[in-house]
A protein has these predicted regions:
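Active-site metal-binding loops of divalent metal-dependent hydrolases
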Residues: 7, 35, 161
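Short amphipathic alpha-helices and their capping/turn segments at secondary-structure boundaries
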Residues: 20-23, 96-107, 136-153
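Short catalytic/ligand-binding loop motif for oxyanion handling, primarily in non-cytosolic enzymes
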Residues: 11, 39-41, 61-62, 120-123, ...
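Mobile, glycine- and charge-enriched loop segments
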Residues: 1-13
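Structured beta-strand-rich core segments of catalytic domains in phosphoester-bond hydrolases
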Residues: 35-36, 41-125
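Short, acidic/polar
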Residues: 11-24
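Metal-dependent phosphoesterases centered on the DNase I-like endonuclease/exonuclease/phosphatase
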Residues: 49-51, 133-234
Length: 235
């Protein structure tokens, strides 16, 4: 079982009982975003039951991604790729990590990617950073598809994309569409293009043509209670 989660800080998650939840789950491979901690601290928190690789952000206290595998069930193969490409800037660091894993006894390995896209903010430099990042992600996604075709190693890209794909992925579409980052047509087009190119939206495939399921809710008001959420996390 592969589980992807935005930790909103691994130290804060640890204090809230993250490891107890993880140990009780069937997770074999844990894909993490917003780790927001140095590699040494993150590895120490995960403990001896998990092997892990990390791509921390070069800006202290921001971003950071990781992949952990449960010892005795899954192992890593080769060296991880902790960058998206050679154009990675400090603000883009800690947002892309590739590693190959293999379940005990499995014939075929799996490339797992932990991705954390910029949240953005409409009409600000934050949005400019997001829109500069998305085409580069798309270029790497195309390379991964080509590599699978050539070498037979499938890829699973997981993470917090900070973009919905359609009206089904956000409770309040009309008041947000083209008004807030994450619901802009210029962002949505990238996700739908990747699906057209051959990637599968696993959550949507499993859920079907329904509203939701959501993966993020605002802290404001009663968003969680009213299930007024967004689906911005993908596998």
């Amino acid at each position: 079982t592969v589980t992807t989660v935005n930790l909103n800080g691994i130290r804060a998650a640890h204090k809230r009982g993250f490891l107890a939840w993880l140990d009780a789950s069937a997770t074999d491979v844990l894909v993490m975003q917003e780790v927001r901690a140095p590699e040494e601290i993150a590895r120490d928190i995960m403990g001896e039951a998990w092997d892990s690789v990390w791509a921390p952000c070069r800006i202290k206290g921001r971003a950071g991604v990781g992949v952990a595998v449960r010892r005795g069930r899954v192992g890593f193969e080769g060296e991880p790729r902790p960058v998206l490409d050679d154009a990675e800037t400090d603000v883009d660091s800690g947002r892309w990590l590739e590693t190959v894993v293999r379940r005990e006894g499995a014939q075929t390995p799996l490339r797992v990617v932990s991705a954390y896209f910029h949240s953005g903010e409409k009409d600000t430099p934050k949005q400019e950073a997001k829109m500069a990042h998305l085409p580069r992600v798309g270029a790497r996604m195309a390379e991964l598809l080509a590599d699978e075709e050539e070498n037979g190693v499938p890829s699973l890209v997981c993470g917090d994309f900070n973009v919905v794909r359609s009206e089904a992925d956000i409770k309040n579409w009309k008041p947000n569409h083209n008004k807030r980052a994450g619901v802009l047509d210029e962002e949505i087009v990238f996700l739908n293009r990747w699906v057209e190119e051959g990637w599968r939206d696993t959550v949507r495939d499993l859920a079907g043509d329904v509203q939701g399921p959501y993966s993020w809710w605002s802290w404001r008001g009663q968003a969680f209670v009213n299930n007024a959420g967004w689906r911005i996390d993908y596998q």
